[in-house]
Amino acid sequence: MTNKEKLLQKIPELLNEVKSKNPLTHCITNFVTVNDCANAVLAIGASPIMSEDIEEVAEVVSIADALVINIGKLSHEQVEAMKISSAQANKINTPVILDPVGVGISQLRNKVTLEIIENYKLAAIRGNITEIKTIAKLTGIISESNTAKGVDVSESDIITQDNLNENADVISKLAAKLDTVILASGPIDILSDGETTIAIDNGDEMMPYITGSGCMLSSIVGSCIGATNPLEGTMVAALLMTIAGEKARSKVDSENAGTGSFRAYLIDYLYKLDGQTLINKSNIEIL
């Protein structure tokens, strides 16, 4: 049995662990996508709590199975809440997942991202490839990176089959240096823990046309890691999101609908997907 076959065979068990454990996922995220993140976590069988007041975050994360911190809409109070909760999570070995939304577009986002990376142990970092390459530049892995289009990926960075190996090399080196799992999401997702690197060629081109698809994925990553382990949990989360996107697009096309319906159907299929469907629909490659 190949390593790929072994990974695929574990998917139903990993997904069942998420649903049976119902991991409490503490998300400190942005007000643009908070509702979608909570519903995505619920849809896969986990439980969200969206606490960010500095007076309670240490207590909340103490009962959580994972902490997801998302810098999409920064404030001084929210950054302080992220630091307090990350410190407490590290103290009790609760996994911390970082979504460095828009890192590279401002000095504040760069500063906060580096402070989190340097001071707290992270189980995973999930971002688009421009965000991941920006972190690679900030940490000395590469010398240059493109500037993001706001919080969206730079068009010149978009992952394709032509640049897959080049991007995978950067992601693997960054994962090894930071001792964490890195997931760069896009038309092709790449994830690595520095030793094993996986490409996932699933998803749909409609996904970037709704706000929050990346934030939802990061929250799902937190839930899956909270019930399993960083590399395999991140892989299952990426498969859930991308395959739900494919199915949502098919449903939208059958109804001649648009992005509003796509957003709703995405949540529907996150709820409906099972392990065998993930195996059947997955298009993964171990690089």
Swiss-Prot record:
<feature type="binding site">
    <location>
        <position position="185"/>
    </location>
    <ligand>
        <name>ATP</name>
    </ligand>
</feature>
<dbReference type="GO" id="GO:0009229">
    <property type="term" value="P:thiamine diphosphate biosynthetic process"/>
</dbReference>
<dbReference type="GO" id="GO:0005524">
    <property type="term" value="F:ATP binding"/>
</dbReference>
<comment type="similarity">
    <text>Belongs to the Thz kinase family.</text>
</comment>
<dbReference type="GO" id="GO:0009228">
    <property type="term" value="P:thiamine biosynthetic process"/>
</dbReference>
<dbReference type="InterPro" id="IPR029056">
    <property type="entry name" value="Ribokinase-like"/>
</dbReference>
<feature type="binding site">
    <location>
        <position position="50"/>
    </location>
    <ligand>
        <name>substrate</name>
    </ligand>
</feature>
<dbReference type="Pfam" id="PF02110">
    <property type="entry name" value="HK"/>
</dbReference>
<comment type="function">
    <text>Catalyzes the phosphorylation of the hydroxyl group of 4-methyl-5-beta-hydroxyethylthiazole (THZ).</text>
</comment>
<keyword id="KW-0784">Thiamine biosynthesis</keyword>
<keyword id="KW-0067">ATP-binding</keyword>
<dbReference type="GO" id="GO:0000287">
    <property type="term" value="F:magnesium ion binding"/>
</dbReference>
<feature type="binding site">
    <location>
        <position position="212"/>
    </location>
    <ligand>
        <name>substrate</name>
    </ligand>
</feature>
<protein>
    <recommendedName>
        <fullName>Hydroxyethylthiazole kinase</fullName>
        <ecNumber>2.7.1.50</ecNumber>
    </recommendedName>
</protein>
<keyword id="KW-0460">Magnesium</keyword>
<keyword id="KW-0547">Nucleotide-binding</keyword>
<comment type="pathway">
    <text>Cofactor biosynthesis; thiamine diphosphate biosynthesis; 4-methyl-5-(2-phosphoethyl)-thiazole from 5-(2-hydroxyethyl)-4-methylthiazole: step 1/1.</text>
</comment>
<dbReference type="InterPro" id="IPR000417">
    <property type="entry name" value="Hyethyz_kinase"/>
</dbReference>
<keyword id="KW-0479">Metal-binding</keyword>
<feature type="binding site">
    <location>
        <position position="126"/>
    </location>
    <ligand>
        <name>ATP</name>
    </ligand>
</feature>
<keyword id="KW-0808">Transferase</keyword>
<dbReference type="GO" id="GO:0004417">
    <property type="term" value="F:hydroxyethylthiazole kinase activity"/>
</dbReference>
<keyword id="KW-0418">Kinase</keyword>
